């Protein structure tokens, strides 16, 4: 995501949620029975939340999701959706009950492995009690049918909410970082549980649907609607999942190394947007050279017909507002930033939100790497020295209120540059590629980065990272031959 400070809402205390979840065995109303009685099961309930230091109530324990199959029906004349999500997961222990994250939408039914399951709603959780316990290491499939009007989460510092957003013309888009996926499909809404996806979206025949991954088909039916099918075959964090619907012009081009580039532009600004985004292929080629092979089959941009004042690196389909279309390519840094996130954030995703600098620091530094590559007049070292004049607090543990603060981006990029100066270019660019290879399609932490950088360089780097990530004031940039 491009720089945009965000403030989150406090939520229900974990202990109250856990107590309520254990007590409920009913339908969509709290405390009401579903009519099936109380299922006799052994095992233990999955944890309520994954224990993320910033968002302890988000995500759920007891299982690991392998695949989401999301089906939606939408008519722009109405704000509501009809959905069905299949969730294939593996139990991490003998599981008697588990939770899914879902906001506002009405649950119509829940099945586990084809059998009707009891369920209840406890605030923004769906608590599922299968007919019999699910053994440890067993793979099981939960199917949730749901409907209603998606409600985005409030965000005081953004013109739009988090999650599902609907514009006045009926078009929709998704901007979910960090916890908005639960506004439109039931999920384990935490980046530590990545999964593959497929989407089947039914809309009127005159609408286009953009989503993650590979476009499989967009077949018309006899009722005047079209079903758009997309597949995301590489694991993806929930906050990067996106389905957007509206009237768009689709621009397709062949990118480097066989990557398909597919952009979705509003018709009235499509020509201008095409010019502004025309260098995506060049950026893709350069980043592939320095970061390693592009980790997905396709890439593109979705430009929505409203101002967003931020952008988001939805996996394979980055999101931009129309305010990033100007006709003079002034948004090139943001375009480079979101593309770089496909490696740093999408391919390799932080295990916990406190390590957000791993996303934003590297993506911001990638902007400077692009200009250093593309513009002979650009002075990278002078630019980085100039940035050290800014007052930027610690970023190793920024707190949820400063998750997307300027410090995370700029001090993060300075940390990356300090690392480069310390270990030298050969080790640094080896690190960029190895990071994306070793942790491909998975999660990593700051500790993982330090360990890998030390292994490659042969240097002890804990002191360097402590100073740049955690000290109240960061030190001067090292010189290339100064060690730390």
PLM ranges: what are they?
Residues 2-29:
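Secretory targeting and sorting signals
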Residues 24-294, 421-423, 463, 467:
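Acidic/His-enriched low-complexity segments
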Residues 128-131, 186, 266-275, 325, ...:
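Second-shell loop/turn segments in exported
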Residues 163, 273, 290, 294-295, ...:
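Catalytic zinc-binding patch centered on the HExxH motif and its immediate surroundings
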Residues 175, 203, 208, 251, ...:
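Non-catalytic accessory/interaction domains
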Residues 192, 317-380:
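Zinc-dependent metallopeptidase catalytic helix centered on the HExxH motif
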Residues 233, 354-423, 433, 439, ...:
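Acidic/His/Gly-enriched intrinsically disordered linker/tail segments
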Residues 295-313, 356-362, 378, 382-384:
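Short, solvent-exposed turn/loop segments enriched in Gly/Ser/Thr/Pro and often Arg
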């Amino acid at each position: 995501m491009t720089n945009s400070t965000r403030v989150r809402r406090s939520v229900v205390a974990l202990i109250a949620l856990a107590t309520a979840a254990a007590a409920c065995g009913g339908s969509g109303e709290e405390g009401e029975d579903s009519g099936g009685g109380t299922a006799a099961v052994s095992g233990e309930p999955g944890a309520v939340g994954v224990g993320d230091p910033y968002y302890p109530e988000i995500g759920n324990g007891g299982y690991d999701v392998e695949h989401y199959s999301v089906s939606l029906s939408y008519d722009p004349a109405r704000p509501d959706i009809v959905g069905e999500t299949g969730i294939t997961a593996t139990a991490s222990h003998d599981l008697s009950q588990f939770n899914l994250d879902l906001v506002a939408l009405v649950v119509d039914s829940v099945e586990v492995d084809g059998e009707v399951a009891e369920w209840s709603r406890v605030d923004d959780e769906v608590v599922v009690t299968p007919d019999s316990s699910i053994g440890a290491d067993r793979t099981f499939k939960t199917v949730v049918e749901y409907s209603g009007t998606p409600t985005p989460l409030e965000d005081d510092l953004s013109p739009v909410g988090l999650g599902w957003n609907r514009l006045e013309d009926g078009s929709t888009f998704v901007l979910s970082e960090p916890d908005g996926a639960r506004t439109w499909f039931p999920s384990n809404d935490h980046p530590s549980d990545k999964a593959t996806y497929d989407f089947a979206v039914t809309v009127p025949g005159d609408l286009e649907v953009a989503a993650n991954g590979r476009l499989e088909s967009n077949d018309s039916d006899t009722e005047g609607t079209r079903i758009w099918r997309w597949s995301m075959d590489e694991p993806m964090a929930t906050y990067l999942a996106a389905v957007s619907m509206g009237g768009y012009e689709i621009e397709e081009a062949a990118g480097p190394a066989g990557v398909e580039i597919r952009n979705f532009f509003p018709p009235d600004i499509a020509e201008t947007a095409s010019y502004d985004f025309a260098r995506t292929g060049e950026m893709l080629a350069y980043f592939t050279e320095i970061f390693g092979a592009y980790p997905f089959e396709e890439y593109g941009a979705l430009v929505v017909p409203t101002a967003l004042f931020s952008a988001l690196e939805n996996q394979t389909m980055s999101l931009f507002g129309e305010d990033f279309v100007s006709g003079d390519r002034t948004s090139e840094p943001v375009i480079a930033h979101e593309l770089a996130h496909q490696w740093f954030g999408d391919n390799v995703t932080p295990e916990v939100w406190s390590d957000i600098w791993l996303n934003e620091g590297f993506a911001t530094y990638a902007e400077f790497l692009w200009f250093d590559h593309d513009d002979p007049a650009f002075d990278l070292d002078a630019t980085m020295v100039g940035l050290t004049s800014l007052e930027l607090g610690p970023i190793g543990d920024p707190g949820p209120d400063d998750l997307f603060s300027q410090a995370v981006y700029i001090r993060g990029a300075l940390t990356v540059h300090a690392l480069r100066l310390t270990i030298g270019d050969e080790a640094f660019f080896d690190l960029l590629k190895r990071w994306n290879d070793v942790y491909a399609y998975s999660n990593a932490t700051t500790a993982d980065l330090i360990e890998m950088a030390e292994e490659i360089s042969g240097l002890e780097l804990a002191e360097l990272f402590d100073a740049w990530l955690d000290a109240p004031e960061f030190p001067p940039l090292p010189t290339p031959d100064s060690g730390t």
